């Protein structure tokens, strides 16, 4: 089950914002969360029961609207022999567009970015969105290890969930009090035992972490200098070494040590995605200032480079609030594309001066993402939470490209 891309998360956030703005006149907006292992027939049976129960609603209008929403859900359920891989969410209800009598039935049915865990039926004046909001919390997987010469604990952190994978003990003896040659020989044995223990830790970490495709980083912790000795030695696979974010001094090993590592690393963990975005925009800026740099910006130039397949990474600001429209002239057949914040329904035809009508209107981010996907270009939606993200929006119109080659 793959992790959602930045583009998919952006679209999910946009849908969530749209849903959060909806309000019903009464408690008549219906939300249904269906886990992937739930039988559709069970859900349909429950909907029939709710339809029967809704006959007890006192308000005639609310009763009618709730029953209409449930009937729409029952019809939509017939399209699914079983829930999708991550489950199914359904939001249905009469949403007013203005004063009384302007209500329209609105229906949203989609697979969420993460699996649904619990079946929910909810009817209120707002759609129930809390489970979806929780999906926007950070869910990347991080590798954690706390170690000293006596003990090591290996774990993963995903969102708020900690999984202890392995606890190891060394059997390395403590300091020997004898002096002279006996002391030196004993110290060598201690160092050899410690070396073998660090090798064992590395083997278990390699086995645990190399198989995690979406591993975002590794944090090492523990009392003393054993963690630095481990990191600087030849114990950890070279690909995992690259993912070590930081080392943290802790008072404990074991599970207490793991929790201490997390507590002391919250600032670092929260900055990981932000740093990735910052580095992408900084790379774009470096390319831009070079005479032969592989970068372009602005809608027209980036569109041209996308059409040529020359764009490696497309950078789009999440605050890019423009529409892309297609106008058609019924008289001469001329077609025209136009970008704007609020496109008019008609334009004057440049070919025959007759009136052109807006035949298609779409979000500009969706339009550019579609172009990028057709030519295999990676898309990154950049937030405005960093100085670099604001610079992309304000200085470059929110559209930048890192190129594969200079056309």
From Swiss-Prot:
Keywords: Cytoplasm, Protein biosynthesis
SMART domains: eRF1_1 (SM01194)
Location in the cell: Cytoplasm
Matches recorded under Gene3D superfamilies: 3.30.1330.30, eRF1 domain 1, eRF1 domain 2
Pfam family, one: eRF1_2
Entry keyword annotation includes Transmembrane: no
GO cellular component, one term: cytoplasm
InterPro entries registered for this protein in UniProt: eFR1_2_sf (IPR042226), eRF1_1_Pelota (IPR005140), eRF1_1_sf (IPR024049), eRF1_2 (IPR005141), eRF1_3 (IPR005142), Peptide_chain-rel_aRF1 (IPR020918), Peptide_chain-rel_eRF1/aRF1 (IPR004403), Ribosomal_eL30-like_sf (IPR029064)
GO molecular function: translation release factor activity, codon specific
Protein family membership: Belongs to the eukaryotic release factor 1 family.
Function: Directs the termination of nascent peptide synthesis (translation) in response to the termination codons UAA, UAG and UGA.
Assembly mode: Heterodimer of two subunits, one of which binds GTP.
Name assigned to this protein: Peptide chain release factor subunit 1
Annotated source species: Methanothermobacter thermautotrophicus (strain ATCC 29096 / DSM 1053 / JCM 10044 / NBRC 100330 / Delta H)
Gene giving rise to this polypeptide: prf1
């Amino acid at each position: 089950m793959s992790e959602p891309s930045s583009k998919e998360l952006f679209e999910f956030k946009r849908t969530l914002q749209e849903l959060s703005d909806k309000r019903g006149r009464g408690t008549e907006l219906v939300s249904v969360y269906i886990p992937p292992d739930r039988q559709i027939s069970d859900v349909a049976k429950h909907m029939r029961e709710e339809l029967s129960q809704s006959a007890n609603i006192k308000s005639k209008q609310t009763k009618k609207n709730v029953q209409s929403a449930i009937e729409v859900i029952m019809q939509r359920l017939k399209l699914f022999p079983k829930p999708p891989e991550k489950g199914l969410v359904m939001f249905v209800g009469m949403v007013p567009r203005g004063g009384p009598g302007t209500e329209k039935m609105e229906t949203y049915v989609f697979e969420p970015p993460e699996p649904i865990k619990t079946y929910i039926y909810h009817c209120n004046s707002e759609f129930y969105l809390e489970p979806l909001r929780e999906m926007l919390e950070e869910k990347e997987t991080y590798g954690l290890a706390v170690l000293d010469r006596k003990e090591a604990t290996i774990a993963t952190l995903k969102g708020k969930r900690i999984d202890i994978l392995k606890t190891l003990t060394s059997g390395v003896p403590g300091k020997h009090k004898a002096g002279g040659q006996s002391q030196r020989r004993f110290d060598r044995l201690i160092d050899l035992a410690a070396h073998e223990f660090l090798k064992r830790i590395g083997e278990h970490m390699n086995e645990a972490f190399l198989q995690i495709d979406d591993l975002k980083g590794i944090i090492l912790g523990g009392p003393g200098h054993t963690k630095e000795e481990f990191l600087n030695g030849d114990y950890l696979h070279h690909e995992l070494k690259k993912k070590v974010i930081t080392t943290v001094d802790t008072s404990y090993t074991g599970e207490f040590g793991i929790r201490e590592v997390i507590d002391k690393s919250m600032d670092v963990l929260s900055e990981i995605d932000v740093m990735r975005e910052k580095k992408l925009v900084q790379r774009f800026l470096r390319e831009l200032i070079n005479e032969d740099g592989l970068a372009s910006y602005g809608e027209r130039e980036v569109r041209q480079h996308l059409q040529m397949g020359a764009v490696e990474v497309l950078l789009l600001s999440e605050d890019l609030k423009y529409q892309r429209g297609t106008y058609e002239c019924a008289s001469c057949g001329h077609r025209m594309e136009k970008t704007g914040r609020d496109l008019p329904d008609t334009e004057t035809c440049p070919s025959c001066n007759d009136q052109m009508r807006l035949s298609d209107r779409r979000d500009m981010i969706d339009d550019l993402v579609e172009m990028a996907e057709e030519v295999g270009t990676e898309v990154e939606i950049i937030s405005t939470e960093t100085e670099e993200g604001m610079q992309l929006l304000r200085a470059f119109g929110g559209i930048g490209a890192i190129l594969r080659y200079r056309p």
